[in-house]
């Protein structure tokens, strides 16, 4: 009895049967009214086919009105057992194969010579002969005296009838056996194969297939599943399929070729696509709950997956991975040595136990080399012990070119994506990838070695790729590694940082677009990214956040030879924002800065020049900033700096310069009148005891360069808890624009410090007044630079105590005694909550006087004015009145009158 059971079927109460994946009207289905359909539900339901409406609909007769959900089923093709049904089935089969022009050597010849009319006539003749034989026998018995010839004839007729009946039964049995041998197919489709009836069969496992010896080449066999009984246990792909025999020898690869002595079977690969299960790989439904604990029984997929990789490379087939966890614990590394296409699913997990590797700390889980094209997508790679490299790229075979990694996650390794060999990568793209919670770097790419030119690396692009992680809480740096001061984007001549989330060295044309670089507050991260010795490096639109390094000053990006950093989102960073070293002509454009607790917004080091900064809007963010002046004492600027600020509210005073006060070219300091100067921070020297200080606009200018053609620039320090201080230069004010104001609304400022250096001649006066809210003077004093130290060998300090109730502090300097030196390091400072605050007066010459009054909110307007070469135009300041408040006020009023009389102030 033959069966039809392709697809699934459901039945409604009215007897309508709906199929899924069925072809009920196919010429080979042999389904006709009267056939019985059995639903393999619980309980089993049965109905009788009334009409075949379409390939997916049958009208059936049912007496119970049962409703059956979609399930497995079987249609009993019992009509084939009758002579009429058999003839009709065979006729339909022959018409189908004739229309398909299929050659069926033995079967077609048999059916061509088979005369069904003769078969029917023969059956009728058998019946007539049998009846005639019985009559003849009765007549013979009644009249034995009849002629012997009649008896012989009757006996011959009886024998002929029996022979004809046996022949008919034999023919019917042969054809029915053909139908039954079709098995699950429930049709005679298998007869379309050239080997016809004698080569159709099944084998239960790949191991059994190796032992199945074919009669000849070209035979077909169906493999039920890779492992015996696997198909019944697993609803996932089970490695079954169709194989074709060959007589000869071939290498058994465990999935595509099954070889025996003198023969082998080759898998039929449809649509150039196969699965890892075709090579015997196994998955579990979910990963273990704790990635530090391995399950008691672990199936190692390393050898089988490597064989699948090799086939995908050699035949250009696509390798499909299943949902679930593939375990790997072999000492071998998975290797990709050519173009490959691997496609996983959202739930595909590679779980790696590196403990069996020879060097578990450094050996790679997967190695890619010589991949000239390809795509790897949707794989989640995990290590159970923060060891080894997740995916390593090298050039042991050749350069990697135009490889796309998409939705590839590499987590909890020592390094995530790792490139440690020069010139091994070309045109690699990372799309929506992730390197998370890795022990050292999530992304480590080094294509440059000391003493070599740049490698031949072509563009490496990162699109919406996340690189972040917490790492083990017990992380500690080894003695062989070097840590650096954590800074936001740091560029250095030579650096060997660890703990950063991404490391790039010696690359050209790199783009990191979108995505995220984040440390998630891990105490082990020195920076989010280190970029060194790179050419044309762009970071655009990337979320940079949550860095909290070994100290309070985390580093977001450390960069060298960076080309552009654009439209980045900077959040919750503790440390310097951007540090640049040895990077001529780099570009920073339009990052989004949010709550970055930075030591300095931009820090320039080591031969950095001709840079451009544009589009910054850090107004809200900068109030969280803390500036640090320490820097790295060994680094010096060796090139002339030519910054260019383009429509940016972040200016040069947000830039920290390390030990380079003589290297700044002020002629191109500001190029845009709308630029804003924010937080200029110099490094400290050994003789400067205070770590946080501000430079005024005059800090970088000679007397002739003070205004420098710009109109309005700002300097801000949001060093909490102080209210913001702004230093700005207004070029075209109608009266003396020099007002220097420091708010003391909360009585926070307790002291004013004044400092001088050495090698000055002549004398001058610093004037300090403490004013109340109405402007009345509460206390005044002046100080001679010479009085700090008569020989000027070192710098010195004088303190002015701010009285209670002072709301404003007014500063000024008067050249009183032919002062011809430069006050290169004179500071005036507000001192609040033990946080020092410095304003530096710089490049004051004998023909220059300055006067300023502090007004809220910490705004300083410093305008240059010249009183001429005759110093007598400056009022003299008698020493006897140095501590006399009335005398000081008298001199100040005289100074103001002199300035107004000479046209330097309006009335």
From Swiss-Prot:
Residues 137-169 are annotated as: Disordered. Constitutes the tail fiber, which functions as a receptor binding protein (RBP) and mediates the attachment to the host capsular exopolysaccharides. Displays a depolymerase activity that specifically degrades the K2-type polysaccharides of Klebsiella pneumoniae, which allows the phage to reach the host cell membrane and bind the entry receptor. Gene3D superfamilies: 6.10.140.1630. The keyword Mitochondrion does not apply. SUPFAM superfamilies: Pectin lyase-like. Keywords: Degradation of host capsule during virus entry, Degradation of host cell envelope components during virus entry, Host-virus interaction, Viral attachment to host adhesion receptor, Viral attachment to host cell, Viral tail fiber protein, Viral tail protein, Virion, Virus entry into host cell. Homotrimer. This is Depolymerase, capsule K2-specific. One of its GO terms (biological process) is adhesion receptor-mediated virion attachment to host cell. In the N-terminal section; belongs to the Webervirus depolymerase family. It is found in: Virion. The N-terminus contains an extended triple helical bundle. The central part is a beta-helical domain, which forms a negatively charged cavity at the interface between neighboring monomers. This cavity may contain the active site. The C-terminus is formed by 3 four-stranded beta-sandwich folds. Residues 145-155 have a biased composition (Basic and acidic residues). One of its GO terms (cellular component) is virus tail, fiber.
